[in-house]
Amino acid sequence: FGDANSNVETYFEGTLANPSVTWEKERQLNVGFDATLFRKLDISFDFFNRDRRDILATPYRTIPDFVGFKKPEMNVGKVNNKGFELTARYADRINDFNYYVQGGVWYAHNEVKYNAEMLQQYSYMYRTGHRVDQPFGLQAIGFFKDQKDIDDSPQHTFMKVQPGDIKYKDMNNDGVINENDICAIGYTNLP
Protein backbone atom coordinates (compact mmCIF):
# COMPACT_ATOMS: atom_id res chain seq x y z
CA PHE A 1 0.00 0.00 0.00
CA GLY A 2 1.81 2.99 -1.21
CA ASP A 3 5.39 3.66 -2.05
CA ALA A 4 7.79 1.77 0.23
CA ASN A 5 10.23 4.68 0.07
CA SER A 6 7.80 7.33 1.25
CA ASN A 7 8.60 9.40 4.33
CA VAL A 8 6.11 10.38 6.95
CA GLU A 9 7.01 13.33 9.11
CA THR A 10 5.87 13.24 12.70
CA TYR A 11 6.07 15.64 15.56
CA PHE A 12 5.80 14.91 19.24
CA GLU A 13 6.04 16.74 22.51
CA GLY A 14 9.50 16.47 24.07
CA THR A 15 10.46 17.62 27.52
CA LEU A 16 8.54 20.69 28.56
CA ALA A 17 10.60 23.75 29.33
CA ASN A 18 10.66 25.05 32.87
CA PRO A 19 11.29 28.81 32.92
CA SER A 20 11.09 28.77 36.73
CA VAL A 21 14.33 26.79 37.21
CA THR A 22 16.68 28.56 39.60
CA TRP A 23 20.03 27.86 41.23
CA GLU A 24 19.85 25.58 44.22
CA LYS A 25 20.16 27.29 47.58
CA GLU A 26 22.11 26.41 50.69
CA ARG A 27 21.90 27.41 54.32
CA GLN A 28 24.96 26.43 56.30
CA LEU A 29 26.30 26.55 59.81
CA ASN A 30 30.03 26.25 60.40
CA VAL A 31 31.41 26.33 63.93
CA GLY A 32 35.01 25.77 64.83
CA PHE A 33 37.77 26.51 67.25
CA ASP A 34 41.54 26.32 67.28
CA ALA A 35 43.64 26.15 70.42
CA THR A 36 47.30 25.82 71.34
CA LEU A 37 48.19 24.37 74.72
CA PHE A 38 51.62 24.63 76.35
CA ARG A 39 53.05 25.88 73.02
CA LYS A 40 53.26 22.25 71.92
CA LEU A 41 49.76 20.90 71.35
CA ASP A 42 47.56 22.35 68.59
CA ILE A 43 43.90 21.30 68.50
CA SER A 44 41.42 22.19 65.78
CA PHE A 45 37.71 21.31 65.68
CA ASP A 46 35.18 22.16 62.97
CA PHE A 47 31.47 21.28 62.77
CA PHE A 48 29.30 21.86 59.72
CA ASN A 49 25.60 21.51 58.91
CA ARG A 50 24.43 22.31 55.37
CA ASP A 51 20.82 22.28 54.22
CA ARG A 52 20.53 22.39 50.43
CA ARG A 53 17.15 22.99 48.80
CA ASP A 54 15.73 23.67 45.35
CA ILE A 55 17.88 20.88 43.90
CA LEU A 56 16.87 19.91 40.37
CA ALA A 57 14.87 16.67 40.37
CA THR A 58 12.17 15.04 38.29
CA PRO A 59 8.81 15.73 39.96
CA TYR A 60 7.27 12.26 39.84
CA ARG A 61 4.75 13.12 42.57
CA THR A 62 3.47 16.37 41.08
CA ILE A 63 3.07 15.47 37.39
CA PRO A 64 1.39 12.13 36.57
CA ASP A 65 2.78 9.76 33.91
CA PHE A 66 -0.35 9.86 31.75
CA VAL A 67 0.25 13.46 30.58
CA GLY A 68 2.24 12.08 27.63
CA PHE A 69 5.50 14.03 27.78
CA LYS A 70 8.82 13.80 29.57
CA LYS A 71 8.64 15.59 32.89
CA PRO A 72 10.73 18.75 33.22
CA GLU A 73 13.30 19.11 35.97
CA MET A 74 12.06 21.26 38.83
CA ASN A 75 13.63 22.77 41.95
CA VAL A 76 12.12 20.33 44.44
CA GLY A 77 14.98 18.31 45.99
CA LYS A 78 16.32 18.75 49.54
CA VAL A 79 19.53 17.31 51.06
CA ASN A 80 21.23 17.72 54.44
CA ASN A 81 25.00 17.34 54.95
CA LYS A 82 26.59 17.43 58.38
CA GLY A 83 29.76 16.34 60.07
CA PHE A 84 32.88 17.34 61.94
CA GLU A 85 36.66 17.36 61.72
CA LEU A 86 39.03 17.08 64.69
CA THR A 87 42.80 17.33 64.33
CA ALA A 88 45.54 17.38 66.93
CA ARG A 89 49.25 18.07 66.46
CA TYR A 90 51.96 17.72 69.07
CA ALA A 91 55.35 19.30 68.31
CA ASP A 92 58.46 19.25 70.48
CA ARG A 93 62.22 19.41 70.39
CA ILE A 94 64.83 17.13 71.92
CA ASN A 95 68.25 18.80 71.73
CA ASP A 96 68.74 19.54 68.01
CA PHE A 97 65.98 17.14 66.91
CA ASN A 98 62.58 18.64 66.04
CA TYR A 99 59.58 16.34 65.65
CA TYR A 100 55.81 16.36 65.56
CA VAL A 101 52.97 13.85 65.65
CA GLN A 102 49.63 14.63 64.04
CA GLY A 103 46.31 12.82 63.79
CA GLY A 104 42.76 13.50 62.85
CA VAL A 105 39.22 12.20 62.86
CA TRP A 106 36.60 13.13 60.27
CA TYR A 107 32.92 12.30 59.97
CA ALA A 108 30.42 13.35 57.32
CA HIS A 109 26.85 12.22 56.70
CA ASN A 110 24.37 13.29 54.05
CA GLU A 111 20.69 12.45 53.73
CA VAL A 112 18.10 12.98 51.03
CA LYS A 113 15.31 14.87 52.81
CA TYR A 114 12.98 15.12 49.80
CA ASN A 115 13.29 13.89 46.24
CA ALA A 116 9.76 14.09 44.74
CA GLU A 117 10.16 10.45 43.82
CA MET A 118 7.54 8.17 42.37
CA LEU A 119 5.07 6.60 44.80
CA GLN A 120 6.31 3.17 45.85
CA GLN A 121 4.37 0.15 47.00
CA TYR A 122 6.77 -0.48 49.91
CA SER A 123 8.53 2.06 52.13
CA TYR A 124 11.93 0.33 51.84
CA MET A 125 12.04 1.26 48.13
CA TYR A 126 12.28 5.04 48.70
CA ARG A 127 15.57 6.88 48.25
CA THR A 128 14.36 9.68 50.52
CA GLY A 129 15.83 9.17 53.98
CA HIS A 130 18.99 7.53 52.62
CA ARG A 131 22.38 8.92 51.63
CA VAL A 132 22.69 10.66 48.27
CA ASP A 133 24.75 7.87 46.68
CA GLN A 134 23.09 4.94 48.48
CA PRO A 135 23.15 1.83 46.24
CA PHE A 136 19.87 -0.03 45.75
CA GLY A 137 19.40 -3.61 44.60
CA LEU A 138 18.46 -7.08 45.78
CA GLN A 139 19.79 -8.03 49.22
CA ALA A 140 21.96 -11.16 49.09
CA ILE A 141 21.43 -13.58 52.00
CA GLY A 142 23.71 -16.43 50.95
CA PHE A 143 24.02 -19.08 48.25
CA PHE A 144 21.73 -21.89 47.15
CA LYS A 145 23.11 -25.16 48.55
CA ASP A 146 21.17 -27.69 46.49
CA GLN A 147 17.96 -28.21 44.51
CA LYS A 148 15.91 -28.67 47.72
CA ASP A 149 17.10 -25.25 48.92
CA ILE A 150 15.98 -23.75 45.58
CA ASP A 151 12.60 -25.50 45.76
CA ASP A 152 12.01 -24.25 49.34
CA SER A 153 12.95 -20.62 48.50
CA PRO A 154 10.96 -17.80 46.88
CA GLN A 155 10.75 -17.96 43.08
CA HIS A 156 13.39 -15.87 41.26
CA THR A 157 11.95 -14.00 38.26
CA PHE A 158 15.22 -12.48 37.00
CA MET A 159 16.91 -15.77 36.07
CA LYS A 160 16.81 -19.53 36.43
CA VAL A 161 18.80 -20.40 39.55
CA GLN A 162 20.96 -23.40 40.30
CA PRO A 163 23.02 -24.54 43.30
CA GLY A 164 25.82 -22.06 44.00
CA ASP A 165 23.87 -19.02 42.77
CA ILE A 166 23.21 -16.08 45.07
CA LYS A 167 20.04 -16.28 47.16
CA TYR A 168 18.15 -12.99 47.58
CA LYS A 169 15.87 -11.81 50.37
CA ASP A 170 12.12 -11.65 49.71
CA MET A 171 11.60 -8.18 51.21
CA ASN A 172 7.80 -8.15 50.92
CA ASN A 173 7.31 -11.87 51.72
CA ASP A 174 5.20 -12.56 48.63
CA GLY A 175 7.15 -15.69 47.63
CA VAL A 176 8.63 -14.04 44.52
CA ILE A 177 11.96 -12.26 44.03
CA ASN A 178 11.32 -9.35 41.65
CA GLU A 179 11.62 -5.55 41.33
CA ASN A 180 9.42 -5.16 44.45
CA ASP A 181 12.28 -6.58 46.55
CA ILE A 182 14.79 -3.87 45.61
CA CYS A 183 16.01 -2.01 48.70
CA ALA A 184 19.00 -0.09 50.05
CA ILE A 185 22.05 -2.36 50.08
CA GLY A 186 25.66 -2.05 51.10
CA TYR A 187 27.53 1.12 51.79
CA THR A 188 27.93 4.30 49.82
CA ASN A 189 31.04 5.04 47.77
CA LEU A 190 31.77 8.25 49.63
CA PRO A 191 32.73 8.60 53.29
Q: Where are the language model's segments positioned?
A:
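Conserved small-residue
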Residues: 93-190
